[in-house]
A protein has these predicted regions:
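Active-site groove signature of glycoside hydrolases
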Residues: 83-84, 88-99
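N-terminal pre-domain/capping segments
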Residues: 1-88
Length: 99
């Protein structure tokens, strides 16, 4: 079983410090909102690997996968696909979004 914590990019260093201190933490979910943040998050790959952390991504709160307007709903899917491509080197376990 995995025990995880969540973080945003601005406090990821502090979250990783906690992961180093508490061996039981083996998962981290990082909230990112913009595609350019994929590059910033990718710089932490070595640290994730070193700590043997699985990784999940919390997508922007504004996402609505049940959007009634088809064009907008499809744009969210395209957005998620771009996130996945931008993070392909990180072995993301899942993407999390709220309805």
């Amino acid at each position: 079983m995995r025990l995880g914590i969540s973080a945003l990019l601005f406090n990821l260093d502090k979250a990783l410090e906690l992961c180093r201190e508490v061996d039981r933490i083996n998962h981290i979910e990082v909230g990112i909102d913009n595609l350019d943040e994929c590059i910033k998050l990718s710089k932490y790959k070595g640290e994730f690997d070193k700590l043997n952390l699985s990784l999940g991504i919390h997508l922007p709160m504004e996402l609505n996968s049940c959007e009634n307007i088809k064009y907008i709903r499809k744009s969210w899917i395209d957005f998620i696909n771009k996130f996945e491509d931008g993070l392909k080197d990180l072995n993301i376990e899942y993407f999390n979004m709220h309805l």
